[in-house]
Amino acid sequence: MKKFTQIIDQQKALELTSTEKPKLTLCLTMDERTKSRLKVALSDGQEAGLFLPRGTVLKEGDILLSEEGDVVTIEAAKEQVSTVYSDDPLLLARVCYHLGNRHVPLQIEAGWCRYFHDHVLDDMARGLGATVVVGLEKYQPEPGAYGGSSGGHHHHHDHHH
């Protein structure tokens, strides 16, 4: 079984020759991309293991290096998500504020934001005036927006309103 132990940094990835570039991919859910130890199947069906430093969070496009010198590109799996759209930047900022206030991990892009599907949150976003589309999409929340597999964080603090 191949053991992938390193992420190749962006500069080294650019320097890979065409024969060194990854031909295999590894499709992982957001939860799987937060695991430092994981048994996986590569795009060609080979079994492999991830043995990465604790706290590693993989992103789409990351390139991993195995002990044997093999390389593989990380691909984000499509997951059931809600995508909120608005042409009004202030409205989208308000939606992101309210979702963040509920400690919801968010992917934020120009004109839209995305979170794991939750019909209660969808209703809230619609109530604020945004358009919500539910479907299978790739999901990459902002770094540090989650703690473990639950997707939330667990420290205590006072909210002053």
From Swiss-Prot:
Family annotation (Pfam families): UreE_C, UreE_N
Record carries keyword Chaperone: yes
GO cellular component, one term: cytoplasm
CDD domains cross-referenced by the UniProt entry: UreE (cd00571)
GO MF annotations in UniProt: nickel cation binding; unfolded protein binding
Localization: Cytoplasm
Keyword line: Chaperone, Cytoplasm, Nickel, Nickel insertion, Virulence
Signal peptide: none
Domain of life: Bacteria
Quaternary state and interactors: Homodimer.
Function: Involved in urease metallocenter assembly. Binds nickel. Probably functions as a nickel donor during metallocenter assembly. It is not essential for urease activity.
Name listed for the protein in its UniProt record: Urease accessory protein UreE
